[in-house]
């Protein structure tokens, strides 16, 4: 069972595997497959005329972010995930990528990727705060956000534009203030800020300006988050922001 790029006709099977593995909605999958998916950035294994394992990646300049790695439940324990990942590593290296990135969803996966040569880098801080005196926010279009984000990122950070930004902009809002930049997603009364760059002390005022009682923020920090595997450049990046989680 060798990994191959999927055909367009296999997209329904890819979606079925994804939903079974991660529980995402059809709306989320519609957004991904409409804005971020390319058969050339996916490898899968077919067994008994069904997709048994698959993984995707986003191009992030010198790096590739490997995303949504999944194996069908009845095919687990056969090493298919490892086979797909190894094939992706080889392909990305041939394509000239400096390294690849994953964001494990749990500690067992962090150990699994560690055995494949991945190491923690950068880090995040995540916290929830209540609203305080509001600050001024300015709504941004995606292109302006991307340009401004480059000025806020730490040196040697992973730049996530192209299909990354196209995907993100379908379900997120972008704002800037005097000394900060943020991305916001909302679901009912829940407000999630998957990235706040700049002044983290502005978070309570941002929460008020977003007209919610509380909000959860993710900023650069020290807690384990992304992992890096070198494909030629040993030194990892300093920061990775959007896991699309």
Name each region found by the language model.
Residues 190-245:
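Charged, low-complexity intrinsically disordered regulatory/assembly segments
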Residues 82, 97-98, 105-123, 222-233:
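Conserved active-site alpha-helix within GNAT-family acetyltransferase domains
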Residues 11, 16-58, 150-174:
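Active-site rim helix/loop that mediates acceptor-substrate recognition in acyltransferases
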Residues 92-105, 212-221:
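Conserved GNAT acetyl-CoA-binding A-motif
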Residues 68-71, 77-92, 115, 198-211:
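Conserved acetyl-CoA-binding loop-helix of GNAT-fold acetyltransferases
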Residues 116-200:
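Amide-forming acyltransferase catalytic core, primarily the GNAT-like/NAT-type
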